[in-house]
Amino acid sequence: MAAAEPGARLVLYTRENCGLCDELMAELAPWLSARNLALDVRDVDADPVTRRRFGLKVPVLTVDGVLACYGHLDLAAVERLLDS
């Protein structure tokens, strides 16, 4: 696997009381730590535009603004985006 772009921006869109969001974050945390990557977590309900964009489709994980996965973690997709 190629090294991830140092400036890669990972954003996780979540909402309060979202079990899938909690599961995805728990799965993702050790992977991020092992790669020394930061995660920007945003509440979709805090912004009307973001709420309209994603609706009930949370959690949503993006890499540099590109959809990597939603609902469940797809590490292969995340790694492909980081390596591209």
Residue ranges: model-predicted function:
Residues A2-W31:
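Local sequence-structure signature of Cys/Sec-based thiol-disulfide redox active-site neighborhoods
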Residues Y13, R42, Y70:
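Small/polar loops that bind or transfer phosphate-bearing groups
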Residues E23-A26, R53-L56, L73:
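Generic recognition of short, well-ordered alpha-helical segments
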Residues M25-D43:
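Conserved helix-turn-beta segment immediately C-terminal to the redox Cys motif
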Residues A38-K57, T62, V66:
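Thioredoxin-like thiol-disulfide oxidoreductase module
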Residues V63-S84:
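Non-catalytic, surface beta->alpha helical segment in thiol-disulfide oxidoreductase systems
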